[in-house]
């Protein structure tokens, strides 16, 4: 009997770890990980939050497209070799988030889920379907593959579940239930000492916007979104971070400079400005409390210009009248614009002069310090101008960054002049005609007729298939 008991103990001592291991892995199987609580269809919340929903829908009224390349063809040269040289429009209403990322020439004209120039990460700020997919597939699963893979999945415009925990009891009771629906944004806030779950409501209001209105890059083989805040949020901090990891978004096709492309760093620039330092949040200015027809207060989700709701926004703090404040803002905007153009002129020359140096036989060693100056100059310029509201958020910081960019561009051109002289080139390097977007695109070798034709074919053939598939899968309302 004792011998049988001993054998039984040995048996269970051997087999128990197996059952334990099996049970642990069973908890991590894909099937059990697919519990999804994110509802991406925004209209599902209309009955519960009618005022917020209708004001959110009104972002479709912000429909005008402004072609930034047509307005300023210099940009084509600065972004030569990068998709932004093909197409870059100024931002418009959130209701167009999915439409615009489909229609921009930057995303190409993929024919299959494995085709195209850009990664899945390019959907990350466009839709609550992103939060749903991350919950369903995990971050690694979501980021895996090309942008086109997400076409049939990411179909609802930026909305409720991007900013609110719509599955929570608080949300059901009419409370904001703010959340960071992107795990990478939560990690970034922790990196700067602002864990979301420990932040006050005012901080959370801006952190929610800071999930998308930030500088970011695509990290590693999987091209996962990461914010470059490990060293801090100032332009020099992020520059140091990128330099340390030897990161570049692309290589300028004229100067061969390893470049950085700033995105939309509103959170960083707001934080550096007087509003951010005084805890005036994004919501205070862009989503004020307004009254509905019955006199009930609600948060206006038609995100827009604070001057459109002056009494509910600016007038809460400022004693000046609307016209006076508009004049101040216009002057700051003009000052930033004027310096922006001066920096761009220097950078355009620097890119063509660098090309001339390469053509004249310059070596990598000779060009390295020059390209580093060009890289830093354009990065500082870009971080200033990519934040479209910097004249309001942090005008002093905008001018400081542009002034620094001007200095770096001047350093690059001085070094180029000396290097070109050693190659026997002492005359000014001529520029091609870049007076229009079309001429600038031709100067960098873009075949825009072909690019546009391919895009139109994609929009007519592939996108309808995406939407049909999304409806069949219940991701879009019929």
Swiss-Prot record:
Query: What does the cofactor section's free text say about binding?
Result: Binds 1 Ca(2+) ion per monomer.
> Could you tell me what this protein is called?
Cytochrome c-552
Binding positions for heme c 5 per the UniProt entry: 275, 314, 317-318
Q: Which InterPro entries match?
A: Cyt_c552, Cyt_c_NO2Rdtase_formate-dep, Multihaem_cyt_sf
Q: Which CDD domains match?
A: NrfA-like
What function is annotated for this protein? Catalyzes the reduction of nitrite to ammonia, consuming six electrons in the process.
User: Its catalytic activity?
Assistant: 6 Fe(III)-[cytochrome c] + NH4(+) + 2 H2O = 6 Fe(II)-[cytochrome c] + nitrite + 8 H(+)
Question: Where do the annotations place Ca(2+) binding?
Answer: 215-216, 261, 263
EC number of this enzyme: 1.7.2.2
User: Binding residues for heme c 3, per the UniProt record?
Assistant: 94, 209, 212-213
Q: Where does heme bind?
A: 122, 125-126
From what organism does this protein derive? Answer: Salmonella typhimurium (strain LT2 / SGSC1412 / ATCC 700720)
Known PROSITE patterns for this protein?
Answer: MULTIHEME_CYTC (PS51008)
BP GO annotations: anaerobic electron transport chain; nitrate assimilation
Gene name for this UniProt entry: nrfA
Provide the residue positions that the database annotates as binding heme c 2.
Answer: 160, 163-164, 301
